[in-house]
Amino acid sequence: MGTNSGATAGINNKPVGGAGGAGVLGGGGVGGANSSIGGVLSNSLGGGGSGGLSISGLNAGGQNANVGGLIGVGGMGNVGGDDGGNGMVGGGPNNQQATTPQYTIPGILHFIQHEWSRFELERSQWDVDRAELQARIAMLLGERKCLESLKSDLTRRIKMLEYALRQERAKFYRLKYGTDPPQLNEFKPSNEDAGLAGEVATDSEVPYSSVSNTTWRQGRQMLRQYLAEIGYTDNIIDVRSNRVRSILGLNNNAEHDGSGGGLGGGLGSGTGGENLSPNINGNESNKRASETEGRHTPAKKVQQSIDEIIVDTEAAVMANFEFLGATEMSDDDEISDDLEMVATDNDDTDVKMAKRAKSGKDMLTEDLEADVGEQLLNDMNLMTEEVDGSLGLGELAQLTVNNESDGAYDANSKDGSGGSAGGAGYRKTWNAKYTLRSHFDGVRSLIFHPEEPVLITASEDHTLKLWNLQKTVQAKKSASLDVEPLYTFRAHTGPVLCLGMSSSGETCYSGGLDGNIECWQLPSPNIDPYDCYDPNVHSGTLEGHTDAVWGLTTMQSNIVSCSADGTVKLWSPYNKEPLLRTYTASEAEGAPSSVDFVRNEVDHIVVAYNSAHCIVYDTETGKQVVRLEAAQEMSGNTGKFINKVVSHPTLPITITAHEDRHIRFWDNTSGTLVHSMVAHLEPVTSLAVDAHGLYLLSGSHDCSIRLWNLDNKTCVQEITAHRKKFDESIFDVAFHATKPYIASAGADGLAKVFV
Amino acid sequence: MKMADGSTILRRNRPGTKSKDFCRWPDEPLEEMDSTLAVQQYIQQLIKRDPSNVELILTMPEAQDEGVWKYEHLRQFCMELNGLAVRLQKECSPSTCTQMTATDQWIFLCAAHKTPKECPAIDYTRHTLDGAACLLNSNKYFPSRVSIKESSVTKLGSVCRRVYRIFSHAYFHHRRIFDEFEAETYLCHRFTHFVTKYNLMSKENLIVPINVGENAAPGESEA
């Protein structure tokens, strides 16, 4: 009851008398949650000091004054001097507290409860903060250890290659001169060898980092699993990797040497932000780090695990490794089971590589391919090239290509684990699977349902059609993998040019040459194609544009459209007054050709104009926020016409498809051109970015669609998909948000879906 | 329409094109079209130039495969019939037109179903157009748009017969819509002329009174 009595007593908000003041001072200190209460209590003590009260942590007087104000109880002022520590409620008048308000016991209790809960809250917040900071420390520590172990890993590989090279040279020497070369079995390479080894090392820097990328990818995926187990969801990891990507995005396209140079650079650009994820897992990386460090310090031990495998498998190979000496088998015991897996995996690779190196008179790619897994194979291919590269000292160009595709694999596997998109994760090759034929004329636009394997196409034949990829209507009139449309939307009186779909997938919108935007409630994806006509499917028309509607895109419940009448309009389709706002640019800009919401910035839209400029508007104010243009690049903008503009889903980047065959990347904040590339043989007409922001899909009048890795802006795949009608071929491309589908729409009246 | 560089004419509808400029480019002679869709391009070009010049539109170029010519025309008809269907949707409801009829003589059964069904007129219209779209785009019967199997050509007649009923229903029950549509597109005109010329339907089925003779007269002198 100490608190209670204290509370009763603690009604004086100023220390009474000199002694009281001393008591207060004596107890001064920071006591966390309790301190203020203590302060209140101690005030009552007067000359008695804090004897009777257990809570003695005091704050400054100023805070006590506050407390008094809060309590707002008058008349109870206590001259506690005589009472000492009893905490008795003093009834005596308090001359120093003429203005003190009345105190009541319930009021005080309430106050204390209130304060208590507040302090509790603060404490838990503090705990959370602490945990966060600790996690961060662990993360940074892990990061460091990752880098360290990466370094040791690389060193190990360098040693291996040096060895392989020596073997080769020895063999060469033997073949050429018929005798053993001098110094063959010496561990220390001869001067000549050393020189060459050094050369090799520098020359092959790029491939080294890429090989380690592969290794890291395995480790990363494993760690990702661990993380998932301890509750670090992909979201958190993604946030981190996004951050890193955005950092990398700033020095865009810097490739390996740009972002930090050397090793760090290779790591950064090759493997993206995911390197960071392992760090969260303190234990594992600690163990691993210590293990690798242990290996690293004595140079000879580098090969210990390789030797271990060799003992098991090939004595002959082991003989070759003898010079590497010291096998410290005992080390293995320290390795945890999980890590053993990783280690074995790596070692396996290494052994294979060693074998390869040993027998590698020529390029021996083929014979080993049969018995190694795909992933290993990848390693090996890279490795082979390394060996060749180091021996032949050339082929760097080829290596670069390989690196790029390696990065692509990497991102792909990430994609696989991130989305529901299945796939073993390695190289994903898209193949045409479904042909959607039913339109009589060019398909201008298509859009996927956000979740279902369902899409809608819009055509110049004035109709839209709904397709369910799971309902390949085998029946009467169609061949194997053709899909028959489930529903035909008719309302436009001219070609339909653009499509949008609500995020729920319940509603879709189409804009046509007739200037109307039609709103549709999607029928069930299991509807009978020859069901009765339901007029409610067509749920409204947005009238306002006076000319063809060429662009349409949705964000939550709003849609934005652009039209040949020169305006861009923002709509809220099911409002009483659906038209929210109209944005008009100066005459000089010409008509808008395409529009998109800026995905990482609310209330911003980006509009492409005939002038080949893009303008970002604030939808609320209607003001122009930034103009995307690059003077020298865009000078003489005839032919630079923008066919399509899309916003990156996570980064402040706008991507434009141009008539002059280029795809250009813009920084939304500064409005500057970040990157520009010739992407097709003919005008680029359409763009789509996947939901994770890793891949870009482009379509062109050259009849092909291309898939691009956004990290390094390289083409991952090209597919010839459609035929020409007049001088047009592909009108639109799309990614499914959650399933592994991409699609293209063509002037030949077909739409194709690739899996 | 789009003059890019020098003499090259690029026939493209770029985003932002005004609707009056859509497909407004200099005609391209059929022999210069190297696309597999040349016939469609050619037909659309003629219609774009003057939809009322039915005779010219239906005049088959020399050395043209007749099957392909008929097939592409029928595709074009079905496509343009969407326009009539859109208009009918507004007025023709299952409550007003419970059956697909033209004159009182026949009730047409909808062939889109496993067993032909007495669909309301609007459903009949939609199902017939949807079914025609599927058939004409079928990989089985029409895998190519460059050459057409003889067995598939026979399918065209039945498609013609079915879609013609849409004209006749509109004419007898929604005359205002029909007249408006016809004034714009001359579609029934062209269709009647087409089926007569290529003998795809028997004359007694052509119940919409279109004065074919008047239009056909100059045509016959050419043909």
Curated annotation (Swiss-Prot), chain B:
A GO term, aspect molecular function: metal ion binding
GO terms for biological process, alphabetical: axo-dendritic transport; cellular response to nutrient; microtubule cytoskeleton organization; negative regulation of hippo signaling; negative regulation of synaptic assembly at neuromuscular junction; neuron projection morphogenesis; positive regulation of insulin receptor signaling pathway; positive regulation of neuroblast proliferation
SMART domains per record: Mob1_phocein
Sorted UniProt keywords: Metal-binding, Zinc
Region Disordered, annotated ranges: 1-21
GO cellular component, one term: FAR/SIN/STRIPAK complex
Pfam families: Mob1_phocein
Positions contributing to Zn(2+) binding: C92, C97, H169, H174
InterPro entries, per database record: MOB_kinase_act_fam, MOB_kinase_act_sf
Family recorded in the similarity comment: Belongs to the MOB1/phocein family.
Name of the protein described by the UniProt record: MOB kinase activator-like 4
Natural source organism: Drosophila melanogaster
Gene (UniProt): Mob4
